[in-house]
């Protein structure tokens, strides 16, 4: 990695000479930043220790003469089965402004096992001034044996930082690692400067349209209007009210690798940066769709951020984080709801496919079309008065399907501000109904591997989906959908016990498999690994060496792109191996006389025979890894991204998405289903292809009940809409008592999510459903109570607009229904540590009910207590209730 950072922000290439005036100017450092870390060279000692460094768990040794240039350093040495080692230093900052940090450090290694990961790294945790954390920002060192190498990265906080802890960390590997010359540098931002997509910005130019260009007006029938001259937006109106601000607007672009300013496109070109743009605007009845393509005209690799910006002064408006949370817009910072990656201009990507801002008069949303994924961010910037979508594109001639270019599609629309983010979400469903089609008519719980026929009284447990197809005939008889198991993006390589756990030894085992040492199936997987294995920036295959309960060896990360080319020496890619397994499983379970298949949009698993679909395990496994393997670029279907040094690469989740789309098309054409595990962790766009979604969880961490947060559960529900989402609890079931099982069941009930159980080690070692302890018998009464309620809710269907509220905001409210007879369900949850009471009221007219409504509390089994125009409710901590409102 490069030794220096030429601008405030990144490891830059030569700056492109720009002739036109930029729309927004980037501030470049006139002086070095402030060094915050004390004694980063470990030379100063107090009582034999390098002050003010502290030990991380098992700590470190101080070693005079072994540092860089013969100086003093720290060393961590770890053997198999030992704990974690490292040196840590916490900086109390109490900042009131936002500034970037540059994290640097050096390390050398001797016989370090495994592959690069955050277990051997510079590892930084921060706590923001508002108390929220940002954990695990890392730069990883190479494993094996190597001389001193430097790692550095830019940490871009979203908010002012209260404290920062820097670790020289060594865990999860064996061997010996030395650390030296660590530093944390804070880059000053001049007065009035703001952070804009990871770059410090000062001097935002007032938008000056080309008055020679003709006016172009784009209007919807519901009152949204854009007026443009060439690329500049001169008017933004909602309901006839002007909302536009004199801010840079339209399509803007910044060359990340060249550390350029931000420029606008003129007549479809940005000559200053050597880029062209084709953009088409499609005004519809209730939205404006915008699609196009940006192309490099310089004939070399590029790392570029493309933005489409609406000029909007939304000071005093609300920014919606999700259906439950919003923030008042003010100050000069960016408002965004993102997940962290290691690529792109600021290492961020939006969590939701839509962003919504509103006040009492107007609501405005920007949204990605999930059929056109990319690394994108939806942002409101209070300092620049811009509401925009930003794309990070890596451009290279090697992407044969779109050489040196990247395509995009997004929409702009208005929504009813009275319901904020929920109304924006409902409108998104209306705009993209095909992305939320529910093909499962009969929902139920998720059974992993165990033959359901072997569970006495299985009907009590509400099974709907069988992972692993252990007894397809039985599942067919009882309306349970069965799925063939595949894991798209990996090869788990079992290694002989006497083989050292190193990269080279793993490749040796793999090549022996290729030669047939362990049979035909192992040979095919070896070929697929050598064909589809993704590579890091040094050209090495991604390999994580580990001893998992199901595999002692290592796991290679593979691209499941079906179009990756094979060779006579390596005649398989990963997709081919999986397609072969899928075809064999369907043939093996083919009924002698198949009944007619329903239309895909109304498929009922009860009406099918044989396998009902494909199960993709670990969908977001390795999702954030970056693939630098150039021959894989040739078959890319999604725009490339770029790394911290501006090098184009593939984000792994896009390759998995491509395979997912391929399998989904095959299954849906046959009236079958697609099920995936480990989905809706960080990414939204895989959800539209799926019919059943789920993940494995452990809500009993370190002996304490720690359920997934409301924000996490909200995200799952919103992106599924009315599709089933299922959980599998992997925990110590002896300690996960019936009281906790009930809390788990009630929390799932509130969101319409199916609770399930698997195995403490997620490895079928002593699974819940097959254990001699028969945990399901202990919990059977709870299943019998909650499964019928859950089935009724999910059949009625979740709705984003509740048309109901509680006067105590600590009692959360969701809505399901109406049923065919008009019955509506309001689910209620106390997500606090204290008993909460309040009055629930509903807009009966909006819910299609009359004033003489009957209200029943279904969990407690009693009539709801009337209170004025609503119903009185009191809930214990983590308790849920269902109000059934009927005519």
Question: Where are each of the predicted segments found?
Answer:
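Active-site-proximal substrate-binding groove within the catalytic cores of carbohydrate-active enzymes
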Residues: 399-408, 477, 652-853, 859
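The substrate-binding groove and active-site-proximal loops of carbohydrate-active enzymes
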Residues: 443-455, 459-467, 548-592, 641-656, ...
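C-terminal beta-strand-rich structural cap/linker in extracellular carbohydrate-active enzymes
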Residues: 867-887
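Active-site neighborhood of glycoside hydrolase catalytic domains
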Residues: 578-596, 606-685
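Extracellular and organelle-lumenal recognition/adhesion modules and their flexible linkers in secreted
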Residues: 22-217, 227-273, 287, 309, ...
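Active-site-adjacent "subsite" loops/lids of carbohydrate-active enzymes
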Residues: 484-596, 604-607
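Solvent-exposed beta-hairpin/edge-strand motifs
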Residues: 309-324, 843-861
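Carbohydrate-recognition beta-sandwich/jelly-roll modules
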Residues: 190, 218-508, 612-613, 771, ...
């Amino acid at each position: 990695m490069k030794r220096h950072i030429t601008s405030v922000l990144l490891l830059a290439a030569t700056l492109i000479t720009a002739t036109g005036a930029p729309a927004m100017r980037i501030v470049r450092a006139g002086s070095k930043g402030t060094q915050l870390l004390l004694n980063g060279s470990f030379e100063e000692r107090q009582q034999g220790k390098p002050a003010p460094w502290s030990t991380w768990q098992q700590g470190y040794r101080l070693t005079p003469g072994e540092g860089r240039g013969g100086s003093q350093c720290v060393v961590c040495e770890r053997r198999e089965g030992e704990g974690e080692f490292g040196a840590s230093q916490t900086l109390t900052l109490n900042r009131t402004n936002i500034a970037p940090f540059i994290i640097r450090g050096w390390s050398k290694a001797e016989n370090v096992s495994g592959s690069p990961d955050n277990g051997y790294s510079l590892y930084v945790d921060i706590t923001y001034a508002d108390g929220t954390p940002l954990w695990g920002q890392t730069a990883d060192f190479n494993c094996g044996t190597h001389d001193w190498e430097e790692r550095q990265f830019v940490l871009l906080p979203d908010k002012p930082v209260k404290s920062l802890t820097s670790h020289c960390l060594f865990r999860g590997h064996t061997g010996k690692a030395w650390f030296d010359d660590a530093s944390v540098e804070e880059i000053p931002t001049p007065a009035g400067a703001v952070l804009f997509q990871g770059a410090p910005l000062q001097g935002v130019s007032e938008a000056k349209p080309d008055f020679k260009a003709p006016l172009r007006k784009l209007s919807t029938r519901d009152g949204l209007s854009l007026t443009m001259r060439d690329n500049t937006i001169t008017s933004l109106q909602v309901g006839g009210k002007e909302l536009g601000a004199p801010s840079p607007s339209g399509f803007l672009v910044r060359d990340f690798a060249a550390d350029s300013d931000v420029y606008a496109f003129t007549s479809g070109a940005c000559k200053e940066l050597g880029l062209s743009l084709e953009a088409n605007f499609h005004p519809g009845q209730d939205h404006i769709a915008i699609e196009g393509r940006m192309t490099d005209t310089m004939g070399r690799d590029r790392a570029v951020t493309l933005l489409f910006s609406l000029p909007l002064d939304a000071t005093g408006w609300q920014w919606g984080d999700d259906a439950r949370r919003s923030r008042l817009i003010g100050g000069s910072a960016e408002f965004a709801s993102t997940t962290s990656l290691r690529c792109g201009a600021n290492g961020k990507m939006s969590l939701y496919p839509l962003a919504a801002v509103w006040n009492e008069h107007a609501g405005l949303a920007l949204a990605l079309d999930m059929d056109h994924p990319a690394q994108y961010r939806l942002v409101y910037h209070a300092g620049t008065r811009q509401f925009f979508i930003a794309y990070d594109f890596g451009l290279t001639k090697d992407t044969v399907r779109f050489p040196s270019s990247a395509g995009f599609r997004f929409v702009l629309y208005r929504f009813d501000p009275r319901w904020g983010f929920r109304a924006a979400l409902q409108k998104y469903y209306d705009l993209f109904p095909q992305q939320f089609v529910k093909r499962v008519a009969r929902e139920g719980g998720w059974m992993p591997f165990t033959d359901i026929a072997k569970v006495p009284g299985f009907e009590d447990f509400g099974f709907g989906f069988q992972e692993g197809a252990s007894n397809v005939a039985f599942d067919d008889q009882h309306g349970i959908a069965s799925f063939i198991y595949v894991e798209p993006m990996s090869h788990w390589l079992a290694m002989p016990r006497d083989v050292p756990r190193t990269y080279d030894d793993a490749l040796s085992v793999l090549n022996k498999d290729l030669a047939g040492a362990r049979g035909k199936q192992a040979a095919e997987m070896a070929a697929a690994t050598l064909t589809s294995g993704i590579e890091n920036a040094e050209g090495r295959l991604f390999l994580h060496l580990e001893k998992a309960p199901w595999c002692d060896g290592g796991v290679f990360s593979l691209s499941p792109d079906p179009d990756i080319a094979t060779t006579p020496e390596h005649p398989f890619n990963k997709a081919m191996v999986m397609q072969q397994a899928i075809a064999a499983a369907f043939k093996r379970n083919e009924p002698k006389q198949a009944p007619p298949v329903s239309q895909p949009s109304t498929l009922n698993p009860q009406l099918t025979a044989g396998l009902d679909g494909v199960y993709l395990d670990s969908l977001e496994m390795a999702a954030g890894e970056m693939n630098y393997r150039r021959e894989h670029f040739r078959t890319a279907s999604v725009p490339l991204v770029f790394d911290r040094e501006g090098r184009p690469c593939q984000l792994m989740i896009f390759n998995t998405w491509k395979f997912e789309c391929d399998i989904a098309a095959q299954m849906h054409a046959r009236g079958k289903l697609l099920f995936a595990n480990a989905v809706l962790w960080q990414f939204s766009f895989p959800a539209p292809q799926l019919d059943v979604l789920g993940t494995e969880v452990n809500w009993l961490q370190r002996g304490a009940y720690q359920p997934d947060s409301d924000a996490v559960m909200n995200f799952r529900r919103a992106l599924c809409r009315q599709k089933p989402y299922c959980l599998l609890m992997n925990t110590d079931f002896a300690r996960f008592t019936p009281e906790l099982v009930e809390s788990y069941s009630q929390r799932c009930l509130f969101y319409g999510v199916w609770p399930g159980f698997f195995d403490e080690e997620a490895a079928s070692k002593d699974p819940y459903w097959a254990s001699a302890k028969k945990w399901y018998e202990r919990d059977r009464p709870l299943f019998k109570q909650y499964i019928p309620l859950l089935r009724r809710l999910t059949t009625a269907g979740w709705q984003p607009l509740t048309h109901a509220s509680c006067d105590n905001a600590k009692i959360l409210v969701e809505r399901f229904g109406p049923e065919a007879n008009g019955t509506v369900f309001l689910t209620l949850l106390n997500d606090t540590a204290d008993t909460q009471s309040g009055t629930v009221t509903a807009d009966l007219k909006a819910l299609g009910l009359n004033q003489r409504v009957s209200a029943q509390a279904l969990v407690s089994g009693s009539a709801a207590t009337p209170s004025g125009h609503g119903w009185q409710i009191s809930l214990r901590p983590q308790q849920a209730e269902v109000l059934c409102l009927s005519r």
